[in-house]
């Protein structure tokens, strides 16, 4: 009879029951000669990831494996053990799909070295399989419970939440002290990875006491597993799902971002297509992961924060604000805006062949007049408007906890000299002034810029995480909604730009009428650009802005990726998606943007929202130390940082293309930085005579 491993350990005290029913305090057990103990770890459940209202984005469930429970045999030679185990495998195959494959040596060595631990023979059981087997497994088979990660909303916010996976396969061979009883989980992507330490709990401990003949004397849980902390995001799950639904109906590939201007909180960051996070539980096969990578729609790639695209005409408000702030133009300055202008040997066109005539800045924004912006961009100069763009967050990652976030690109003379072998020329300036050329930004950056213009004087510091809480609900870290980067621009200049953006949607001849709302004035800017290799003839469309006009509260950006040879425009494709989103939320938006009422002191009962938190595990089988039910519960979120009152200003109280900058698709065997880097698309074609990028006339409405 094989004996247990010869490991020495102090015999624990405390209430426990021996295999034959004796107490742990029974002196006979303590006095057994050559008795040995083995300590095992009980992996703790990960803490939940929640939306701002306490809705779970990631939590845990109890899943079950089918396992062989060897027990102690009177006669235990190799042939007998292998034959007995084979019969258990045959029985298991009758009830579940995908029973694991074992060699005779595997079956024998598990009995020889670790028969006191179950041998898992299946993946997670399906609900139907579990119900069929519950209480009917037969001799030698057991249902073995483990904690499994669960993503209740499937693909919702998949690029932000990320996914988790097993740290490694369970060990084989002789048992070592402090081995995990089942596979431990670690974050592999997104918040799951970036907040892995906060989400991980503290393992529990179990000790097994054996006699010299290998029979189990005592099984004792000495420490219960302690669940991980709670990560509360700024996302609004209802809004996130609505945005994803709008994208699903409106495009095959695109992105939708919404930011609370008052706090900088990211409420929505949707990318289409996404992927079901539950496909990664408990793990994903190499074949399935490769299929996701090879999918031409690139579901693992977040267009919202990893994609770098020319912002096109959605960038024009930045140029207008820079020119107004510098005094290059005033609200009343009229500039003749023909159908095209000539710079050197090149002609730069408007999107329409009809001259706009002498127009002011508000009309230029409303009509998205390229020739007005060519001229004004050159007058104010690239240093001024590109400098303001950087202040508004273009050209740098936002700093949010996002893996593979693009920095975009705002060129400098140094960058141009290094990469294009020239300084920024007038032709480059003309292209940049309409958001094209080498200028690149993500939808998240465009929405952030709109938040700054909507605010008028400052750029809110973006937030994606509201709080990280410990198991007891104590706040480990919390966002600071008061943090802002001051722009140093004339508030009146920003007001003029906002008026022009209002006319885009609500004025005569505006290019964004498709986004007009029934209950408030929305300010926006359309944008359309060529994108990708010229051979694909592919365009993308933008609609970005904020609402309401008189006291902006929400900034947004929507990106529509067109198919090759498809005619698209921001006014026709992206603007209607914005309308659909905000009209659906009409009552909620109206309430949140309503002017604050006179304060009235009242005494009322606490009706604070509930935030789902991980609580200490109570439902543990005392015999095994394994979970019997999810260790989750609810508790009032009395310590959440409140948002500012509705309506209250917190400060008062060429050929154009996009490079997939820093594109990251996370894979199970990714390198240390967790990223896979793809080759960029073909370089931009340049004019052989002057090497100046040209802006192609792209229709706006």
Please place each PLM-identified region on the residue numbering.
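C-terminal, active-site-flanking charged/polar segments
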Residues: 550, 572-595
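Conserved serine DD-peptidase/penicillin-binding transpeptidase domain
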Residues: 137, 172-195, 199, 223, ...
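Beta-lactam-recognizing serine transpeptidase/beta-lactamase-like catalytic domain environment
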Residues: 58, 210-222, 261-314, 318-566, ...
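Short coil/loop residues immediately preceding or within conserved phosphate-binding loops
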Residues: 44, 230, 251-253, 300, ...
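Compositionally biased, proline/threonine/alanine/serine-rich low-complexity intrinsically disordered stretches
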Residues: 3-24, 591-592, 596-701
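N-terminal leader/targeting segments and the immediately adjacent pre-domain N-terminus
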Residues: 16, 227-247, 270-272, 690-693, ...
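Solvent-exposed, polar/charged alpha-helical surfaces in well-ordered, non-transmembrane soluble domains
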Residues: 55, 64, 83, 87-90, ...
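Membrane-proximal periplasmic segments of bacterial cell-envelope enzymes
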Residues: 1-216, 223-224, 249-255, 261, ...
């Amino acid at each position: 009879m094989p004996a247990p491993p010869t490991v020495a350990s102090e015999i624990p005290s405390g209430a426990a029951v021996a295999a034959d029913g004796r107490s742990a305090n029974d002196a006979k057990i303590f006095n057994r000669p050559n008795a040995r103990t083995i300590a095992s770890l009980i992996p703790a459940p990960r803490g939940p990831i929640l939306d701002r209202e306490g809705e779970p984005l990631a939590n845990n469930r109890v899943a079950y494996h089918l396992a062989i429970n060897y027990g102690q045999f009177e006669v235990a030679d190799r042939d007998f053990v292998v034959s007995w185990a084979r019969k258990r495998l045959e029985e298991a195959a009758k009830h579940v799909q995908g029973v694991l494959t074992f060699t005779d040596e595997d079956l024998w060595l598990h009995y020889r070295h670790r028969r006191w631990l179950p041998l898992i023979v299946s993946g997670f059981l399906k609900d139907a399989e579990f119900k069929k087997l519950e209480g009917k497994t037969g001799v030698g088979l057991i249902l073995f419970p483990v904690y499994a990660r669960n993503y209740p909303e499937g693909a919702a916010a998949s690029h932000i939440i990320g996914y988790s996976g097993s740290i490694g396969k369970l060990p084989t061979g002789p048992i070592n002290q402090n081995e995990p009883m089942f596979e431990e989980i670690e974050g592999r992507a997104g918040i799951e990875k970036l907040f892995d330490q906060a989400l991980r709990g503290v393992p529990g401990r179990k000790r097994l006491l054996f006699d010299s003949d290998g029979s189990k004397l005592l099984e004792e849980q000495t420490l219960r597993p302690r669940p991980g902390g709670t990560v509360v995001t700024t996302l609004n799950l209802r809004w996130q799902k609505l945005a994803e639904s709008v994208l699903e109906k409106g495009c095959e590939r695109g992105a939708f971002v919404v930011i609370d201007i008052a706090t900088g909180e990211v409420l929505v960051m949707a990318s289409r297509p996404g992927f079901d996070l539950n496909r990664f539980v408990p793990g994903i096969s190499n074949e399935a992961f490769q299929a996701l990578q090879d999918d031409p729609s690139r579901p693992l790639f977040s267009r919202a924060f990893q994609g770098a695209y020319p912002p096109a005409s959605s960038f024009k408000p930045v140029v207008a604000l820079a020119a107004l702030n510098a005094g290059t133009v005033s609200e009343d300055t009229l500039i003749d805006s023909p159908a095209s202008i000539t710079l050197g040997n090149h002609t730069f066109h408007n999107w329409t062949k009809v001259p706009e005539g002498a127009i002011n800045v508000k009309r230029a924004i409303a009509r998205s007049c390229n020739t007005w912006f060519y001229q004004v961009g050159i007058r104010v100069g690239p240093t001024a408007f590109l400098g303001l763009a950087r202040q508004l967050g273009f050209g740098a990652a936002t700093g949010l906890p996002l893996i593979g976030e693009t920095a975009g690109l705002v060129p400098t003379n140094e960058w141009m000299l290094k990469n294009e072998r020239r300084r920024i020329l007038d032709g480059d300036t003309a292209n940049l002034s309409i958001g094209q050329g080498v200028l690149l930004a993500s939808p998240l950056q465009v929405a952030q810029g709109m938040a700054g213009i909507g605010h008028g004087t400052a750029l809110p510091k973006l937030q994606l995480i509201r709080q990280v809480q410990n198991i007891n609900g104590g706040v480990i870290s919390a966002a600071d909604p008061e943090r802002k980067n001051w722009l140093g621009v004339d508030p009146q200049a920003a007001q003029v730009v906002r008026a022009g953006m209002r006319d885009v949607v609500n004025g005569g001849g505006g290019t964004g009428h498709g986004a007009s709302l029934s209950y408030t004035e929305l300010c926006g800017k359309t944008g359309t650009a060529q994108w990708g290799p010229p051979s694909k003839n592919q365009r993308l469309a933008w609609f970005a802005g904020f609402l309401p006009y008189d006291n902006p509260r929400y900034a947004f950006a929507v990106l529509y990726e067109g198919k090759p040879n498809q005619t698209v425009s921001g006014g026709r494709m992206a603007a209607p998606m914005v309308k659909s989103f905000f009209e659906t939320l009409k009552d909620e938006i109206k309430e949140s943007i309503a002017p604050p009422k006179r304060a009235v002191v009242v005494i009322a009962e606490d009706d604070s929202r509930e935030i789902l938190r991980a609580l200490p595990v109570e439902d543990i089988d005392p015999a095994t130390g394994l979970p019997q039910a999810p260790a989750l519960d609810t508790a009032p979120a009395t310590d959440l940082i409140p948002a500012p009152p509705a309506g209250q200003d917190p400060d008062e109280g060429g050929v154009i293309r996009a490079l997939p900058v820093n594109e990251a698709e996370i894979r199970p065997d990714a390198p240390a930085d967790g990223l896979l880097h793809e080759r960029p698309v073909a370089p931009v074609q340049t004019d052989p005579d002057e090497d100046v990028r040209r802006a192609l006339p792209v229709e706006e409405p």
